[in-house]
């Protein structure tokens, strides 16, 4: 917990916090009065240290108390004076102990939270709309909660999954619209004719699909020029044209908007996306596959980098003009680059190359996610590696008075 400004020195708030924590009844699950149950096993290691040992400068506001011989039942505790960079600041403890930090400003508090390697859930209590907007724009976590508790995620309302080291691999939020995408392997299918699916689309999006991308869409126009410069076949150019249209539709209807599918009056449950850096390794295959993947990333506004043994004429110029970093390098140099990514973290999209060699190079690092599905024309699938999801839940009333907050797309 980070207390900002005057609340950090408020005796009234401190009394309320102590009262709230002390009011919890600790007991076994079969006891109806229990609010806090046992640990899954006896406290040991870092958790036992968190429950019993203070770091320099810290003090107990409420000291945890062991309640049984097994070491699984503990009365919750609160420690004050947690310093930036200390063990209690940086480490996750799965037990009934709360650490309190202080910050002079909201930005300082956000920085303290974002310094942690993990980013599963985060919450804010504030009645200032500007503070809420600022916090929503800067905090790094997969599930955000405003003016309510930060647990109890419900399927569809608050799809569950984190950022940073709170997520491992190429999966997506449980209970969200993309969860099954990460559990399957996608292959391309013959594209449907535009008239097969545009009837149900909004007029503006339907018009885009009917006409396919033209010069009015700079991302698509640049990609098509690159394909022509690389002497792609007419069939490949047609496939690329339809893939680019699929990207535009996916962006306008899913990835580039903020959606609240629940429509509740007293609670806002927004789902949105943020672009993330991706390194693409192209080994072999159709040049339009590389152009198509790069264009998908550019559509999301992600920072895209490309590595390949060589580039067809015009492709390197296309990438450079679009702001994409690119390297012509052999497999040995690529593996060295992948090892560097293992140290810094990131996502890798593999095209026409052996995933095992790259997996060996990154050494199983949990900070790297590998995507090696065949390239597909569906934007709803191909754009996902360039995005991360965020669920935002806001209590939309104050003592029954409606109070809506604008939740914007992430930059």
Locate each region found by the language model:
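Long, low-complexity segments enriched in small/aliphatic residues
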Residues: 45-58
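Conserved C-terminal structural/oligomerization subdomain of aldehyde/semialdehyde dehydrogenase
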Residues: 2-6, 15-29, 33, 37, ...
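Diglycine-centered glycine-rich loop/turn motifs
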Residues: 60-65
């Amino acid at each position: 917990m980070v207390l900002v400004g005057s609340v950090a020195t408020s005796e009234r708030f401190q009394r309320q916090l102590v009262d709230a924590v002390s009011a919890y009844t600790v007991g076994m699950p079969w006891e109806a009065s229990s609010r806090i149950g046992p640990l899954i096993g006896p406290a040991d290691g870092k958790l036992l240290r968190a429950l019993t040992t203070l770091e320099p400068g810290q003090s107990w506001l409420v000291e945890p108390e062991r309640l049984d011989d097994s070491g699984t039942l503990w009365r919750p505790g609160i420690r004050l004076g947690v310093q930036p960079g200390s063990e209690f600041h940086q480490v996750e403890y799965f037990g009934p102990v709360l650490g309190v930090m202080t910050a002079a400003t909201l930005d300082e508090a956000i920085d303290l939270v974002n310094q942690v390697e993990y980013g599963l859930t985060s919450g804010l209590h504030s009645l200032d709309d500007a503070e809420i907007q600022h916090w929503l724009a800067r905090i790094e976590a997969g599930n955000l909660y405003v003016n309510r508790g930060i647990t109890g995620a419900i399927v569809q309302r608050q799809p569950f999954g984190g950022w940073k080291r709170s997520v491992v691999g190429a999966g997506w939020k449980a209970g969200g619209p993309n969860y099954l995408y990460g559990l399957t392997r996608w292959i391309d299918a013959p594209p449907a004719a535009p008239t097969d699916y545009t009837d149900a689309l909004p007029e503006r999006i339907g018009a885009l699909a009917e006409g396919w991308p033209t010069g009015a869409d700079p991302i698509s126009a640049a990609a098509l020029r690159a394909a022509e410069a690389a002497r792609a076949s007419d069939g490949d150019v047609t496939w690329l044209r339809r893939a680019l249209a699929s990207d535009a539709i996916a962006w306008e209807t899913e990835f580039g908007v903020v959606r609240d599918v629940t429509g509740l009056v007293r609670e806002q449950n927004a789902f949105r996306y943020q672009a993330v850096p991706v390194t693409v390794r192209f080994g072999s295959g159709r040049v339009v596959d590389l152009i198509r993947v790069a264009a998908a990333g550019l559509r999301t506004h992600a920072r895209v980098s490309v590595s390949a043994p060589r580039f067809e004429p015009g492709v390197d110029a296309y990438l450079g003009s679009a702001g994409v970093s690119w390297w012509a390098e052999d497999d040995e140099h690529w593996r060295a680059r992948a090892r560097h990514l293992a140290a810094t973290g990131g996502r890798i999209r593999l095209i026409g190359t052996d995933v095992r060699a790259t997996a060996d190079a990154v050494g199983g690092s949990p900070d790297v996610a590998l995507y090696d599905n065949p390239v597909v024309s569906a934007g709803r699938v191909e754009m996902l590696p360039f995005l991360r999801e965020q669920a935002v839940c806001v209590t939309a009333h104050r003592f029954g008075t409606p109070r809506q907050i604008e939740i914007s797309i992430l930059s």
